[in-house]
């Protein structure tokens, strides 16, 4: 990737790439100080931003042209210079000469400085634009225009980047203010303010991505019906008063935060000058500033509301707070809206302060001596729920909804707090999906039957590679329900003892994948119990634990799911780790999880896994590396996976594997033997669960049963409404906890170090 080189002292000589040498400079427009950026409230620091060896120069009196002054003078740019611009995947970064025209509110670029008097190669309007920093490349900034265009730019150094960001944001802010003062009630463009940066901030520290907890989206939405526009405006006056009250409370909390940070000592492990704390101060202030401007725009729109007798023009627009005007006051006050009422609804995507939260369980905490018996075994029944339903392709109205969503998102945007349309939901919770990874419990329990550490680690790798295919239901990429804080899922499996054998012993008779191996006599089977719980909502952390007392085996795992928008796909990173403990052997196998990707989200979405995961046992010295290969752009196979098991003390590879994680896997051992496993023919052991009427109120299937019911009927509106009710109940409970300053206490898991462990694990009780 070509990158801009830093300038040398005096602006000449350049770096390794002289064509990319940045020569940005501010030019005088002949404006008075009152018309300069400093006069508009933007802090210009001539000393800090001065020319220091080829950098940018800025002064308060000569930064920008006065929009109103200058008479018949030739209009001059506020800033110009060389930046690297990302063009496309093949050409990468290219040096271009950029000119910022403050008076016109335009960012233009040319091939080089000599061609700047010709027609520009590209022009980006800065009115209502968002300027944010990016970690994709050094000294990178991204400019998002209000019409959806985007420029990815790189400066030569941090000072150069800072100058451009400051001036671009000042220009965007100025023109947004001017447009809101002139015709606030008759604008026809669509403006979206996203928490990737804010044009209202001139602080250097604030010019980075806002935290993921930042508030969401304020959109200007066109209403075709003038009557609907008048009704919407009349509804907002009282609602905005409540928003103002909430803003006042948040401002007070932000002041307390700043005071607490500034009260920290000047030395020690944590000081008031800590980089992360400075960023926290800046982003919180910038967020409030942005929200304040949005609220001012909304208030101006309400004041401009026409009387009932007035007939506005067809182009009149409504400033909407997070969504359609028909939503309740409580939703507006919370700053959140539920998912789409239907696939063709009038939508504005809202970013939630918390990811799909619902009411927490009011059941008492488990007693410390209650043991790991989570549910009554005699109440459990085999799960007969049909998982093989055929899903149709994306319908046209659904595709338009997804396309609208994509237009609201930015590359790399965190989707953890984005409300997704209900029709893309899978009919199960994420906690149940983790349980479905255990659909081959015979392979898991067979690990303990290995006679040597080598046999056991290879058996674990075999189980690991065959676990993921059953966790994915159907061919289409569907999103499971986001577990709410306090949600739990319980199930178990019964595995006939004659099915649990080491791979080195004589193989047992094959069973069809459509057969469900069951033990008629419970005494002739092993019992594997499973419990999962959502222990945190920010970040969203799920924990699950399973154990088999008879085999003295248990698995404890915590996973933080972090999703990211990647254009035509969505990536989900599963951050965390699991530990498999074999108590009879004193071995602990630590493992991580791959990332998941939903591809082709506009047509027929499909899922693939990607990334490198590690499995290691400190006691035996064995480790394994498993690589899930994503499909390349051109050619290549899908769902490919490779693995290698190694004995670290002797640096010996004892096993290699390759194939497809949802198809055929071939294992080659150190003794020359090979083994082929077809995951599609492996027997699937059904889960055993209690019926819904005997499940607790916070157990996944009971909690989501109404949503699941309406999704099965195809009633998206009703499913969306049920989901919204769950979310609203949870927000009420969360506000109660905040008021009482009562921290959330998970029911079955406790924090330990950087992770979470089951409160009464097998290794502590046996």
Swiss-Prot record:
Localization:
Cytoplasm, Cytoskeleton
Bias kind Acidic residues: ranges: 366-383
Assigned keywords, A-Z: Coiled coil, Cytoplasm, Cytoskeleton, Lipid biosynthesis, Lipid metabolism, Lipid transport, Lipid-binding, Methylation, Phosphoprotein, Transport
Protein name, as recorded: Oxysterol-binding protein-related protein 10
Assembly and partners are described as: Interacts with OSBPL9. Interacts with DIAPH1.
Question: Can you list the disulfide-bonded cysteine pairs?
Answer: none
Where, per the database record, does this protein carry Phosphothreonine?
198
Signal sequence coordinates? none
Alphabetical list of SMART domains matching this protein = PH (SM00233)
Q: Which GO terms describe its molecular function?
A: cholesterol binding; phosphatidylserine binding
Where is the sequence biased in composition, kind Polar residues? Answer: 325-337
Q: Which GO terms describe its biological process?
A: lipid metabolic process; lipid transport
